[in-house]
Design a protein with these regions (language model features):
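Hinge/cleft segment of the Venus flytrap/periplasmic-binding protein
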Residues: 24, 162, 166, 177-178, ...
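Extracytoplasmic "Venus flytrap"
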Residues: 32-54, 58, 63-81, 85-87, ...
């Protein structure tokens, strides 16, 4: 397995190097695609690699990445940068919907097609959307909780960044799924901001107050792991179950944490970078494409 991974890694490196060399003088670039990522984490890295890899199947495609590091103003600046560069197409993963919507609409008004990925904006004024159904993920988590707790127990929720659409939709799906279950009570929530450290710090404080949590649901695996570590510091990790979302493979990520027993379950949240680039190229090359592209999810 190690040698196969090394060979795959070497092949990917050589392909990237070849693409870089062929386009470094700009003469072979047919399309310049800007990618504005809201954050910089392993889930985003996987998506970026998928986009880069898919772009190699097309001649003369230059993909430029910028990350806003969870900061609305940084992302607004990044989008303005790409607009000023007159990119041929813009891919945007919005940090917070309300803050980033005007920037996406500005790009559209300038004639730049925009593919919105993962998180939505507060408008239909974009060219295409690619992402999972976050309401369904929340609902699926809720149904899993009902089954896992046999219809009775206290749960605590760690949400993602409050202004981001996945956080809002996952919460709404969860609450709708639990609405008809009177013996399952959501005893509280904190905003973990999608970050392991922030979730861990807040859950540490929560556990000093709440002594009766049966299951802790965090809206991504990083926050679920942060919550688990906070509980372990207090010697309470065996008192409750931990459930997350993402199911990334690899050391210290969600899939491994389910196998090792740290997480009780996680739900696949597909990155879909290859699909994003395929749709981007369909738009650029005037081929048919769907405006709304929903990626499937599943329980692990």
């Amino acid at each position: 397995n190690t040698s196969v991974n090394m060979k795959n890694g070497l092949l990917y490196f050589l392909l990237c190097l070849a693409a870089l060399v062929s386009s470094c003088d700009g003469t072979n670039t047919r399309y310049h695609i800007g990618v504005s990522q809201c954050s910089d984490d392993e889930w985003r890295h996987k998506m970026n690699k998928e986009m880069q890899r898919e772009a190699l199947f097309y001649d003369g495609v230059q993909v430029e990445f910028r990350t806003a590091k969870d900061n609305n103003q940084y992302q607004i600046n990044d989008i303005n940068y790409f607009i000023d560069r007159k990119v041929d197409l813009l891919i945007v993963a919005p940090n917070e919907a309300a803050a980033i919507t005007p920037s996406v609409e500005k790009a559209i008004k300038k004639g730049i097609p925009v593919v919105v990925v993962d998180r939505k904006i507060l408008s239909d004024n974009y060219t295409a959307f690619v992402g999972a159904d976050n309401y369904k993920i929340g609902s699926d988590v809720g149904h899993y909780i009902v089954s896992r707790l046999n219809g009775k127990g206290n749960i605590f929720e760690v949400t993602g960044l409050q202004g981001s659409t996945p956080a809002m939709e996952r919460h709404r799906g969860l609450m709708d799924a639990l609405a008809g279950i009177p013996n399952i009570k959501r005893v509280g929530s904190v905003d973990g901001g999608w970050l392991q450290s922030q979730a861990g710090e807040k859950v540490d404080s929560v556990l000093r107050v709440h002594k009766d949590i049966d299951l802790l649901f965090a809206q991504n695996d990083r926050m679920a792991i942060g919550a688990y570590l906070a509980a372990r510091q207090q010697g309470r990790e065996k008192e409750m179950l931990f459930v997350g979302v993402d199911a990334l493979p690899g050391k210290d990520y969600g899939l491994e944490q389910v196998i090792s027993g740290v997480l009780d379950a996680t739900f696949i949240y597909p990155t879909g970078g290859d699909k994003v680039m395929q749709i981007a190229m369909n738009i650029l090359e005037k081929r048919p494409f769907e405006k709304e592209n929903i990626l499937s999810t599943a329980l692990v």
